[in-house]
Amino acid sequence: MNLSEFDYHLPDELIAQEALADRAASRMLVVHREQGRWEDRCFRDLPEFLRPGDCLVLNDSRVFPARLFGHRSGVHSLAVGKNNPKRHEFLSGAVEVFLLRAVSQDGRDWQALVRPGRKMRTGERIVFDEGLEAEIIARGEFGERTVRFLGSGDLYAAFDRIGHVPLPPYIKRDDSPADRERYQTVFAREKGSVAAPTAGLHFTPEVIERCQAAGADVATVTLHVGLGTFQPLHQEVVEEVKLHTEHYRITADNAGKIGAATRVVAVGTTSVRTLETAARDGVLEGETDIFLYPGVPFRRTGAMLTNFHLPRTSLLVLVSAFAGKDLMLAAYRHAVEARYRFYSYGDCMLIV
């Protein structure tokens, strides 16, 4: 199977640059797999498609301000007297650090993307605001770095103060204070994601209450979203694709709710990947690099709410595997013609 089969054309003006003022006002394209058809609805209509015995599964991972801006720290010698060099540090060269995930037990070593990457060598230090400092300690096979934050103190508190919201690159603007709220689901709890589980952005407490009133139970899972989930794939043969790993967890209580459901309605591809990993491996917590493509069975997911995805990505392949490639690509063409809003701050699709 070739990756070129999972491509489509999207005009730039359909890529949502701002969140709607009302989370639940998004449009929702409902795709009926068995009938091979779709209908245009509003997200607020979601409870109409739920029934007693359903379990709505939400990813409660919380986005943290993962973009840090600092400067390279160099060493400069200043001669003071004939044989008395005094060394002091000077700042040179702007550096951006995009944190991906903590990789050490104490939480001070992080996998990160560093720009400009080619100029930053192992052993170099980066100085951020408030005196926060990090050292590059390793280079990864995909060009990422491992950085170690020096000193002590609560790193997440420091990130909250000096970090920026990690908006995706297709949102062509700087982050704003409003993004701290809107690029976060109302049910986010567990810090660790560098990208929002975007299907959850549409929910309000009122919509969740209406889903429960329709007879659906609500469970949460946690998958900390990494950058690799959204990146374009570089392997042309779909079956050869290898994804980056992400950490997931399902509590025993939530596993019980999911197991008792007659139909599991997964909110977002991250919830799908968590559910399908646990069903495949029989493990409620661990690392997953599961890649769902046409031909791979879905063991637990009965319906799915998802946003619209970029061409040639693992997520477009995933929804095509769930709904059928031809039906999914036809639905995407309709969404373009009907001028739906695309990607993270855009509209959503319900696949039943």
UniProtKB/Swiss-Prot annotation:
GO molecular function: S-adenosylmethionine:tRNA ribosyltransferase-isomerase activity
Chemical reaction(s) catalysed: 7-aminomethyl-7-carbaguanosine(34) in tRNA + S-adenosyl-L-methionine = epoxyqueuosine(34) in tRNA + adenine + L-methionine + 2 H(+)
EC numbers, comma separated: 2.4.99.17
GO biological process per UniProt: queuosine biosynthetic process; tRNA wobble guanine modification
One Gene Ontology cellular component annotation held by this UniProt entry: cytoplasm
Main location group: cytoplasm
Compartment(s) where it occurs, according to its Swiss-Prot or TrEMBL record: Cytoplasm
The keyword Glycoprotein is annotated on this UniProt entry: no
InterPro entries (UniProt xref): QueA, QueA_dom1, QueA_dom2, QueA_sf
Paired cysteines (S-S): none
Top EC class for this record: transferase
Pathways involved: tRNA modification; tRNA-queuosine biosynthesis
Keywords noted in UniProt: Cytoplasm, Queuosine biosynthesis, S-adenosyl-L-methionine, Transferase
Complex and partners: Monomer.
Similarity comment text for this entry: Belongs to the QueA family.
Free-text function comment from the UniProt entry: Transfers and isomerizes the ribose moiety from AdoMet to the 7-aminomethyl group of 7-deazaguanine (preQ1-tRNA) to give epoxyqueuosine (oQ-tRNA).
Protein name: S-adenosylmethionine:tRNA ribosyltransferase-isomerase
Organism of provenance: Solibacter usitatus (strain Ellin6076)
Gene that encodes the chain: queA
